[in-house]
Amino acid sequence: MVMRKLLGGSSFDRYCFGMLLAVEVLISFTFLGYIHFPPISITIAYMPIIIAACLFGTAPAVITGIAFGLGSMYKASATYVLPMDMIFSPFNSCEPLASLFLSVGTRTLLGLFVGLAFSAVRKSAHFRSWLCLLSVLAIRLHVFLVYGAMGVLFPQFGRNYTIAFRLDYLDILSAVVCIFLVAGSWELYNSQKVQQIKLYIDRSSITSFIENSLQHRALGFFAVALTLTIVAAAYFTQRTIYMLQQQGIKIDSDIAGDLLHLQLQFVMAIIALNVILTLLVVCVYRYLAYKEYLGAMDSLTGVMGRKLFLHNCEELQNKQVLLGNKGKGWFLFFDVDSFKNINDNHGHLVGDQVLRDFAGRLNEALSAYGIVGRLGGDEFAAMLYELLDKKALIDILDELYRQLDEILL
């Protein structure tokens, strides 16, 4: 998966970036990209790019920039927008490549440059100060890139890069809002509570096999839902046109196209909201699943308790059957020799330590091949689902017995 390569092994980071990307789509396709209190209007559509660069790095910031650019290009493709806005659309301007660079290319470069800048200072002892400075500079960089490209590609509009060096009270207010959002996101992400949630989600007990299966099904469902949503948008556009015509309003091809354009814009906003909600539900599910998993662990030894172990044995057997291994593997029982004598002669504290060490050695030796659990008292079991031959198993067990003898001695 592309997301896994970009964000490493953290499921939590992938979910957070997915939500941030959906927020970018939402505000790029709606009025939410602007905070408007007449006569003040502040754009915040670029802020998810800066937050992505701050939290996740260069590649996620570039992807977010592309999403911003595509949203800008789509909105500029309607026939009712202002002439200056039309140059952001390859379909409305006379220079399609220039418009593509102006709308998508400049926002992609913004993500690249801001991502590289945050990556360069991430390990700095004064990162918070750099965060504030880069947040402000990112705003000016966005203005510089967009108006600089406009000055070169569309000079007839009289706008150029010098606008980036002009400051008024709106620019100062935008900088304050940007610092507040970026710094707030950074502090929230690195707070103790959120980091604990991240740890739980990343360690959740959903196996990669099950997770991949669910992801493939989810992608298939999403593709079907997206197709049906677009069909529904086209249908409602047609019905809207019919209703207006019945009222005596003449609808030409441009108006019909704009109605469909607005319907699809609405669809994108709804999809973005649903993605955010879905990812939040997944995060809550995996967090609670891991809390339940911890509750089923053996508190003394740190390995699975009896109930959880037997449940996982059944799940793993079913998985092996699905993978075509016909449930083959090894099921091993272990107990501590003369454990009652250890407790009687040395006390329960020593006995507990022996159990902890015993379970630790079992887990260390066998967890790469299967799962380990405590059945009760001094009895343990392991289910090995890797296809080991008898000789390989004997070699592993010989080394394990040698380590276990060291504990008991």
Regions found by a protein language model. Give the residues of each.
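Short helix-perturbing small/polar motifs within transmembrane alpha-helices
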Residues: V2-I27, Y74, A78-G151, V182-E187
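Hydrophobic transmembrane alpha-helices
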Residues: V2-I63, L137-G158, W186-L188, I197-L262
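Short hydrophobic/aromatic beta-strand micro-patches
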Residues: M383-Y385
